[in-house]
């Protein structure tokens, strides 16, 4: 037998062996898309008693309800801290500001540390989201990542 014949037989045997092994492999489970991510909405607030109720009402009317809404009260001198529990959301009293931090970013850091969601949404207290805001945000996140 010549060298090209041996090469052809070797390739044929390997090809057949590959198909045999491929057919013996277990099938992959059917793909099922992951569910909706759990969404935590974090709201830093300092003296937002006039605007916070509208935002909390808009969040209660979302077509996709968040796992949790956390208001981080950044040392307000008005009724901000009292408004949020009445709406059924969690309120965190901001801890003293560490050196090198700014108030809003420190408040958001504290909220992020306490949140339980996979997707964190940061909103200012004067935001007025549409009823489909969170649903669109999550859909875009699932489609494009983030």
Where are these regions (language model features)?
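Acidic helix N-cap motif at the loop->helix transition within catalytic regions
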Residues: 50-54, 78-86, 132-134
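Short, acidic, metal-binding catalytic loop of nucleotide-sugar glycosyltransferases
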Residues: 57-66
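A conserved acidic beta->alpha catalytic loop
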Residues: 65, 73-82, 96
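The conserved acidic donor/metal-binding loop of glycosyltransferases
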Residues: 124-128
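Short aromatic/hydrophobic "clamp" motif used to bind/position activated sugar donors
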Residues: 108, 120
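Conserved donor NDP-sugar-binding/catalytic core segment of glycosyltransferases
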Residues: 132-146
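Cell-envelope/extracellular polymer assembly enzymes that use nucleotide-activated donors
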Residues: 37-40, 68
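N-terminal membrane-anchoring/stem segments of glycan-assembly enzymes
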Residues: 1-35
